[in-house]
Curated annotation (Swiss-Prot):
Pfam families: Anillin, PH. GO terms for biological process: actomyosin contractile ring assembly; embryo development ending in birth or egg hatching; gonad development; mitotic cytokinesis; multicellular organismal reproductive process; oogenesis; ovulation; septin ring organization. GO terms for cellular component: actomyosin contractile ring; cytoplasm. Residues 542-557 have a biased composition (Polar residues). Signal peptide: none annotated. It comes from the Eukaryota. Required to maintain the structure of the rachis, the central cytoplasmic core of the syncytial adult gonad. Failure to maintain the rachis leads to premature dissociation of oocytes and thereby impedes oogenesis. The lineage of its organism: Eukaryota, Metazoa, Ecdysozoa, Nematoda, Chromadorea. Keywords: Coiled coil, Developmental protein, Differentiation, Oogenesis. Localizes to the surface of the rachis. Residues 892-1005 form the PH domain. Residues 1-29, 272-295, 539-558 are annotated as: Disordered. This is Anillin-like protein 2.
Length: 1009
């Protein structure tokens, strides 16, 4: 009969395997068998092992290695960690008594069960151990539980009970049944209970019942009472054989999972590291992969943090101390230990040592660098000991690099990031929330510079690791250049979109806070809340994809201008010569219908009794130019344009003559070049004539818009244009293509690309490699891209018959100077063409328009767009790269809110105020019906271009509606027509009015200052 005895100890028993910290990484472990493991295990004593002690590689403690340690076996750098783990395991076996590895916890005060004598896997825990030890208080072991997840607590009392139950003459070693060496037993792979005795009861039952456990079943089962009752039926000889088969070796926790299918004892080394890739692994194993990271703690953390994570050492047998004193002593040892984090490093000396070590080094079976020099023959006892608690992750080492992350509690975000992409820092402002002292130290410029100054690319170990990283799709980046973990989203066309990985808590919308949010943000939140809720419930949201083709029609072109017309300035259609003929300007009288366009009192109406002397001698406070200076400046611009127009006309005539000669000589290359020059010159002439008309109309305006600041002049470079052809196009007839880019009076074109060289192959894309640069562009510039196409003429070769050859020779004999006379006739023809002789007919350009596209500032980047007005053989999509200069930050801000727009065209014939959603961005106010239209990227209903504003400043209108103001605009509807408009607006409240006036006036000040 089993009898309980009370044995009192003078000191609390030693805790050989303290319970770990609560972490998601405790749910999955695997063990790696190396040569050191076989040498330290008594059952593998016959394995030949090299007993020469070696000095550990101190480079893995160096700050140049980064902030974390990687323990992935195939990736290297694990020799020293393996030595440390072997030492911990060897010391545990030497110091620990012989006891049974039992699988049940209960207190001494717990009443025994009726069948307690038969259950040999009951582990007794003294009450003092639980009450005095802070680790047990933290984990809160409940009474009466048959199953406990943390590591087993082993002490002398449990082993003595088990020895007494078996008899005095029997000596039992550590019980550990390994199904890897028993062919008839099935084993659960990657289980936490495979090597610490928690799955022993299940394996006992499998012996008697001969049942097979599925291989993919990774969830251990609790021992059932039926299984425990059948234990005594197992043959004792069979049990002794199983118990002596393999001993438990703790501490070998790596990233390499165990191999479930091993049939012979000699096959352990063959199956090491045989793990499938991340992409090929199933989701269940991929989820476990996120918990198989072992990272050492930071030794620079505050004392409070180190106290909460104790690290027990390896005490001797005779000195048994209490858990509290043991933890304190180990904490003191770690404080005094020098791990090389604070020592000063000489970059040159460090590189020299690493290169010397690389030249004299070899690689072991784990691809780790091993040095055989005599000075490295040092015992492994000098390796700092690493306990189980220190192996819990306090620094998350992932594939995103060496950036240190704060510990995220389990359950907050357990989503795994399989791929990571480094992102450059955009600012120096680092979020200090949730960072300890170690984080601040690691982000110092000195440490960043130190890590960047060590070129490790020429070391064999690093080259091997880089190859392994490429195989496993790992990314390793320096700490100083990159920050923040990101995920890589793979798109259809091969491009990637970077998205930040954020915590779910940060995605929650914060409540309105008057102390942190501005008035504009608060009002925007209030105004858009009902629309956003309706939009989310409706589910009709639309988000444009950045990878697919998009329409880039600029809203400044298709959006009508807001306001009512007040006056018009039109230029006559008579062009003539600007130097001699006077330009006729007609100022249209204001119609009677427009008299009531603005029923409220305007600024001019309030000051009609004042003198008009200021208007006659108008001086702008922005440009400091008088009206006379402006007129002279406009005249100089017009005369300069007229001279340019004359040169363009001469170029057109030369291109026409060259085209006629190329067609007569049947020279295809010269004909294509002449067609290109003729197309460019004719398009440039149209743009120059339109600009002359615009300047002539602008010269008679009394109050033109003030000039824009020269710092807002932009530049844009467009390159790598690729036009897609129709899929049914098979190049039966050869075509030539050209792309023209137009802005104001300038036009640039690419070279002619023909399909003659690719006549036998089928083409789908036409590439243009030119880089076209535009400078001195306005804030709201728009570049029009047009695609032209022509069919390449195919001339037949002259017949070389005998009659033709004889006729040519006879002709040359009779007329020996025919070639000279033909050249003289060509020169006369060219002179007569220049003099515009009667009967001369200019040839037509064979290039035909087949698609267009509008580009603005928002279309910069590597993008793909749709073409408008597409004709065969184009498919309708174009891909290009564009780079645009940035605007000052003051003009690039956005301001949003609701505004009332006055409109007299109401159905009842009365003036009406319509409520619109307005946005001020880059000097233009856009209007939508509601915020949802803006979010869906719809075309605005109307716009106000502040660069065309003639107001010196926008102020509140007196004697009108509450919170009313107006803006005067000068708009060029056509090149020969300028229209003056007045836009009457009103805000919802006085605060809204003040905010809008400040935003508009600040924009005007920045544009004109």
């Amino acid at each position: 009969m089993y009898r309980r005895e009370n044995i009192n100890f003078s000191h609390p028993p030693q805790l050989k395997s303290p319970p770990p910290m609560s972490s998601p990484l405790d749910s999955n472990r695997s063990y790696r068998w190396t040569s050191l493991t076989a040498a330290n295990n008594s059952k593998f004593a016959d394995t030949p092992v090299k007993e020469t002690p070696q000095k550990p590689d101190m480079s893995w403690w160096s700050p140049s290695r980064g902030d974390t340690w990687r323990l992935n076996a195939p990736r290297g750098r694990t020799l020293d960690l393996v030595a440390a783990f072997d030492q911990c395991s060897r010391q545990d076996q030497l110091d620990s008594p012989r006891y049974a590895n039992l699988g049940r916890y209960r207190r001494n005060s717990e009443p025994m069960q009726d069948n307690e004598k038969e259950v040999v896997t009951t582990n007794f825990i003294d009450d003092s151990m639980i009450e005095d030890h802070e680790e047990y208080e933290e984990h809160d072991i409940e009474l009466g539980t048959d199953f406990y997840d943390p590591h087993m607590i082993r002490h002398h009392r449990s082993s003595e009970r088990f020895e007494q139950s078996l008899g005095t003459g029997q000596q039992i070693e550590t019980i550990h049944i390994s199904t890897r060496l028993v062919p008839q037993l099935k084993r659960v792979p990657n289980s936490d209970y495979a090597n610490d005795g928690r799955g022993d009861m299940k394996e006992y039952g499998s012996i008697s019942k001969k049942n097979e456990t599925p291989i993919l079943d990774g969830t251990p089962k609790r021992p059932s009472p039926l299984t425990t009752r059948n234990i005594h039926k197992v043959d004792i000889n069979r049990m002794d054989h199983l118990m002596k088969t393999e001993n438990t070796v703790a501490g070998f926790i790596t990233l390499t999972p165990q191999v479930s299918k091993v049939t012979h004892k000699s096959d352990f080394s063959k199956h090491f590291g045989q793990e499938e890739s991340v992409r090929a692994s199933p989701m269940s194993r991929r989820n476990r992969r996120g918990t198989q990271t072992i990272v050492l703690p930071s030794f620079d953390s505050p004392a409070s943090v180190r106290k909460s994570i104790p690290s027990p050492g390896l005490p001797t047998k005779t000195d048994i101390r209490s858990p509290s004193s043991l933890v304190k002593s180990i904490a003191n040892d770690f404080e005094k230990a020098d791990f090389g984090f604070h020592r000063k490093i000489d970059a040159a000396e460090e590189i020299a040592q690493l290169r010397k070590r690389a030249d004299n080094s070899t690689f072991d079976e784990n691809q780790n660098m091993v040095s055989d020099s005599a000075e490295d023959n040092v015992s492994n006892d000098f390796v700092p000991r690493i306990s189980h608690l220190e192996m819990h992750p306090s620094v998350h080492m992932g594939i995103s690099g060496y950036a240190k992350k704060n510990h995220v509690p389990y359950g907050e975000s357990n989503e795994e990031v399989l791929y990571s992409l480094p992102i450059k820092k955009q600012s120096r402002n680092v979020d200090r929330e949730g960072m300890d002292q170690t984080d601040e130290i690691l982000l110092t410029p000195r440490a960043i510079t130190m890590r960047q100054s060590l070129p490790f690319s020429d070391i064999p170990e690093e080259r091997t690791c880089d190859k392994i990283d490429e195989m496993f799709d790992f990314v390793e980046v320096p700490t100083g250049d990159y920050d923040d973990k990101t995920t890589l989203e793979r798109t259809v066309d091969g491009y990637a979109e970077v998205k930040s990985q954020k915590s779910p808590n940060k995605m929650i919308r914060n409540r309105l806070d008057l102390s942190t949010n501005t008035y504009q943000e608060i009002e925007f939140e209030k105004d858009t809340t009902p629309y956003m809720q309706e939009f989310e419930e409706d589910g009709t949201g639309y988000s444009a994809s950045s990878s697919g083709p998009q329409f880039t029609r600029s809203p400044t072109l298709v959006t009508p201008h807001a306001g009512q017309s007040v006056a018009e300035y039109r230029v006559s259609d008579k062009e003539g010569c600007a130097k001699t003929e006077k330009v006729v300007v007609q100022k249209m009288s204001q119609p009677s219908a427009l008299a009531t366009s603005t029923p409220k009192g305007t600024f001019a109406w309030r000051n009609k009794n004042q003198s008009n002397a200021a208007d006659d001698s108008f001086v702008s406070s922005i440009s400091n130019f008088s009206a006379a200076d402006k007129i002279n400046d406009s005249k100089r611009q017009i005369s300069k344009l007229i001279e340019t127009i004359e040169k363009t006309r001469k170029h057109i005539q030369l291109a026409e003559i060259s085209l006629i000669d190329a067609k007569r000589a049947q020279m295809v290359v010269q004909e294509l070049a002449s067609q290109r020059v003729l197309l460019i010159c004719r398009e440039r002439l149209k743009l120059q004539l339109d600009e002359v008309r615009r300047l002539q109309a602008l010269s008679v305006v009394r109050h033109p818009p003030p000039p824009i600041n020269r710092h807002f002049k932009s530049a844009m470079v467009i390159s790598n244009i690729a036009i897609h052809l129709n899929k049914n196009f098979n190049c039966r007839g050869s075509f030539a293509f050209i792309v023209a880019l137009k802005c104001r009076t300038e036009i640039e074109a690419t070279g002619v690309v023909t399909l003659l060289a690719h006549y036998q192959t089928r083409m789908h894309v036409i590439h243009f490699g030119e880089h076209m640069h535009f400078s001195n562009l306005p804030v709201d510039f728009v570049i029009a891209m047009e695609v032209y196409m022509m069919r390449v003429p195919e001339y037949k070769a002259p017949e070389k018959t005998c009659a033709a050859v004889l006729a040519a020779k006879f002709r040359n004999l009779l007329v020996p100077n025919s070639a000279h006379r033909r050249a003289r006739n060509n020169s006369v023809l060219s002179n007569r063409t220049v003099l515009s002789m009667p009967g001369y007919q200019a040839p037509d350009c064979d290039f035909r328009f087949c698609g267009k596209l509008t580009l603005d500032r928002d279309s910069a980047g590597d993008r793909q767009f749709y073409l408008d007005d597409v004709t065969y053989p184009l498919e309708g999509t174009v891909k290009l790269q564009s780079h645009c200069s940035s605007l000052p930050e003051a003009i690039d801000v956005e301001y949003r809110g609701f505004l009332y727009l006055f409109d007299e065209r109401s159905p009842n014939g009365e003036a009406a105020w319509d409520r619109y959603w307005a946005m001020l961005h880059r000097g233009i106010i856009f209007f939508w019906k509601n915020p949802i239209d803006e979010k869906n990227q719809k075309v605005p209903l109307s716009q106000i271009d502040l660069t065309k504003c003639t107001n010196q400043s926008v102020e509140e209108t007196r004697n009108g509606r509450d919170h009313e103001f107006h803006i005067e605009l000068l708009i060029d509807q056509t090149p020969s027509l300028l229209e003056k408009r007045r836009v009457v607006l009103a805000a919802e409240s006085s605060d809204h009015l003040a905010s809008w006036l400040n935003a508009i006036n600040d924009t005007l000040f920045v544009l004109r200052s």
